[in-house]
């Protein structure tokens, strides 16, 4: 069996078009464009690339991107004051603080300072809690994007066994919630799990989000499974690879995401989707 690729770039373009059309519909009626404030603290090269991509996507879709670049030694109080100002700004519909922050910041304190209605990353505990009880919310972007990728396959995942490898607040835990709410039977493997291979071997859906190259060998994959590789790791030779041994896994899976070009584009696309959702909620329509 050779897996079919789930093309994240193609699905992301579909989401972009939905957002672009929504923005055009509103601005054609004389309304302001949606506004996204992007806050970058420090000069982490990877973060700079991610932020540049987000700002470029905003521009392409008609969303006004507001840049706030702060030096790495910025006191936490200054960042919190900036967030307060953005919370109060009626022209700002979404606030994104690029992670990771420098070591002297308390990340949870920063995230919780963002108005949940403007938390377009979907990281605020209020929004994750609403997701858990099936209430409308701004959903965490990467898991939200994964669900859109799964939908694109046309497969039915209700009642299937799903395994999430990784239990981070940003991906693993909300990913498990998304899959459970979609009707899958979900197992989460984390650093204390001793039999990850056995769990993966039984899974119809495998989502891996740890950040370790070749963490999941291809031979672990159940024939016919769907494999979503969230990991993005740069090797010494400059290549980007995921957490799954791609070539071997693709010989067994029915569907698989590539790295790059799989989940990555979807994270940015769903950020834009959340921004237009926040904007429309704030318009009251």
From Swiss-Prot:
PROSITE patterns: THF_DHG_CYH_2
Annotated EC: 1.5.1.5, 3.5.4.9
A cellular component annotation (GO) from this entry: cytosol
Keywords: Amino-acid biosynthesis, Histidine biosynthesis, Hydrolase, Methionine biosynthesis, Multifunctional enzyme, NADP, One-carbon metabolism, Oxidoreductase, Purine biosynthesis
Pathway connected to this protein: One-carbon metabolism; tetrahydrofolate interconversion
Similarity remark: Belongs to the tetrahydrofolate dehydrogenase/cyclohydrolase family.
Lineage: Bacteria, Pseudomonadati, Pseudomonadota, Gammaproteobacteria, Chromatiales
Record's protein name: Bifunctional protein FolD
Residue sites binding NADP(+) per the record: 166-168
Gene3D superfamilies hit by this protein: Leucine Dehydrogenase, chain A, domain 1, NAD(P)-binding Rossmann-like Domain
Catalytic activity: (6R)-5,10-methylene-5,6,7,8-tetrahydrofolate + NADP(+) = (6R)-5,10-methenyltetrahydrofolate + NADPH; (6R)-5,10-methenyltetrahydrofolate + H2O = (6R)-10-formyltetrahydrofolate + H(+)
Superkingdom of origin organism: Bacteria
Coiled-coil spans in chain: none
GO terms, biological process: L-histidine biosynthetic process; methionine biosynthetic process; purine nucleotide biosynthetic process; tetrahydrofolate interconversion
Function: Catalyzes the oxidation of 5,10-methylenetetrahydrofolate to 5,10-methenyltetrahydrofolate and then the hydrolysis of 5,10-methenyltetrahydrofolate to 10-formyltetrahydrofolate.
Cross-referenced PANTHER family: C-1-TETRAHYDROFOLATE SYNTHASE, CYTOPLASMIC (PTHR48099:SF5), C-1-TETRAHYDROFOLATE SYNTHASE, CYTOPLASMIC-RELATED (PTHR48099)
GO-annotated molecular function: methenyltetrahydrofolate cyclohydrolase activity; methylenetetrahydrofolate dehydrogenase (NADP+) activity
Subunit structure: Homodimer.
SUPFAM superfamilies recorded: Aminoacid dehydrogenase-like, N-terminal domain, NAD(P)-binding Rossmann-fold domains
Species assigned in the record: Thioalkalivibrio sulfidiphilus (strain HL-EbGR7)
Entry's transmembrane regions: none
């Amino acid at each position: 069996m050779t897996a079919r690729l789930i093309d994240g770039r193609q699905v992301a373009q579909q989401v972009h078009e939905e957002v672009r059309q929504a923005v055009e519909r509103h601005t054609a009626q004389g309304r302001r464009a949606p506004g996204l404030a992007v806050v970058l603290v420090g000069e982490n090269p990877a973060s700079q690339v991610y932020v540049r991509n987000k700002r470029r996507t905003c521009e392409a879709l008609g969303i006004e991107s507001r840049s706030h670049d702060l030096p790495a030694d910025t006191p936490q109080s200054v960042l919190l004051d900036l967030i307060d100002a953005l919370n109060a700004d009626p022209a700002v519909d979404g606030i994104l603080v690029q992670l990771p922050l420098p070591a002297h910041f308390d990340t949870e304190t920063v995230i919780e300072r963002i108005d949940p209605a403007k938390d377009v990353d979907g990281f605020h505990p209020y929004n994750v809690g609403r997701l858990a009880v099936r209430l409308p919310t701004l959903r965490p972007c990467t898991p939200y994007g994964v669900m859109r990728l799964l939908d694109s396959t046309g497969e039915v995942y209700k009642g299937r066994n799903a395994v999430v490898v990784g239990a981070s607040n940003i991906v693993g835990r909300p990913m498990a919630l998304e899959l459970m709410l979609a009707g899958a039977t979900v197992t989460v493997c984390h650093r204390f799990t001793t039999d990850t291979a056995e769990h993966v071997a039984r899974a119809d859906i495998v989502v891996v989000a740890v950040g370790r190259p070749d963490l999941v060998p291809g031979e672990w994959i159940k024939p016919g499974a769907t494999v979503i590789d969230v990991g993005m790791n740069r090797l010494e030779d400059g290549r980007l690879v995921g957490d799954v041994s791609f070539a071997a896994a693709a010989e067994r899976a029915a569907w698989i995401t590539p790295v790059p070009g799989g989940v990555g584009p979807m994270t940015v696309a769903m950020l834009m989707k959340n921004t237009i959702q926040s904007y429309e909620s704030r318009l009251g329509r």
